[in-house]
Amino acid sequence: MAACTMSVCSSACSDSWRVDDCPESCCEPPCGTAPCLTLVCTPVSCVSSPCCQAACEPSPCQSGCTSSCTPSCCQPACCASSPCQQACCVPVCCKPVCCLPTCSKDSSSCCQQSSCQPTCCASSSCQQSCCVPVCCKPVCCVPTCSEDSSSCCQHSSCQPTCCTSSPCQQSCYVPVCCKPVCCKPICCVPVCSGASTSCCQQSSCQPACCTTSCCRPSSSVSLLCRPICRPACCLPISSCCAPASSYQASCCRPASCVSLLCRPACSPLAC
């Protein structure tokens, strides 16, 4: 006959009950409706008892059986906030979501080991001391240079001036191999002819990105930043002007600060 206590015995037991003649149903009530097995009625094998497999809510059933079994609630998700990480739980290596490697395949050297400190990544719910160091690369520091002009990029040390609106520019970052954005002004695109590419100059993100002779000034009223009237627009018209080898200045309309068509001033009828 199993032992029992008054806390779990049914009303069938009188006040003058003894351990030897207590009904067996008093000591083994259903686990779902009973308060919980006490130290007297706790089974020897805690794993086989449903009371020791409680849900993730704090349960009084986990008082005397933590040494012989591991509750199922102690296996929470990796990075989800779980209310069941008590002392009976085995430490789990919780890897933050934000600390996943994002380096490109061909530039693995740009990665740096992170210690998953709170300042490393933003908005992470799992930055505990059990984190394994991973390669944490800022999102904003990816190369965006064109394929044919890789020299226009400058190496940056991921300082606040490197990229804008980055969630990963904290103090835990040691300078890494961070290829900056290829800063190419919209209005300073090469306008050289196809035969004279040598007049163009690569841009290094400075205001003076092109040579004066190569890059025409942009119109102050143009929103498209197109160059002002190129000399190619002032070709002579053979029926009224000089030969193609040398044309007269009066045959071409002067460059206009508001004209984007750059048509010649003269026409066959005008000459």
Swiss-Prot record:
Transit peptide found in the keyword field: no
Tissue distribution: Restricted to a narrow region of the hair fiber cuticle, lying approximately 20 cell layers above the apex of the dermal papilla of the hair root; not detected in any other tissues.
Domain of life, source organism: Eukaryota
Pfam family, one: Keratin_B2_2
Sequence repeat start and end residues: 26-30, 51-55, 73-77, 78-82, 88-92, 93-97, 98-102, 110-114, 120-124, 130-134, 135-139, 140-144, 152-156, 162-166, 177-181, 187-191, 199-203, 209-213, 214-218, 233-237, 240-244, 251-255
Protein's name in the database: Keratin-associated protein 10-5
Family assignment from sequence similarity: Belongs to the KRTAP type 10 family.
InterPro entries referenced in this protein's UniProt entry, alphabetically: KAP
Keywords for this protein: Keratin, Repeat
Region ranges (22 X 5 AA repeats of C-C-X(3)): 26-255
Protein function: In the hair cortex, hair keratin intermediate filaments are embedded in an interfilamentous matrix, consisting of hair keratin-associated proteins (KRTAP), which are essential for the formation of a rigid and resistant hair shaft through their extensive disulfide bond cross-linking with abundant cysteine residues of hair keratins. The matrix proteins include the high-sulfur and high-glycine-tyrosine keratins.
GO molecular function (one): identical protein binding
PANTHER family to which the protein is assigned, alphabetical: KERATIN ASSOCIATED PROTEIN, KERATIN-ASSOCIATED PROTEIN 10-9
GO-annotated cellular components: cytosol; keratin filament
Native source organism of the sequence: Homo sapiens (Human)
Assembly and oligomerization: Interacts with hair keratins.
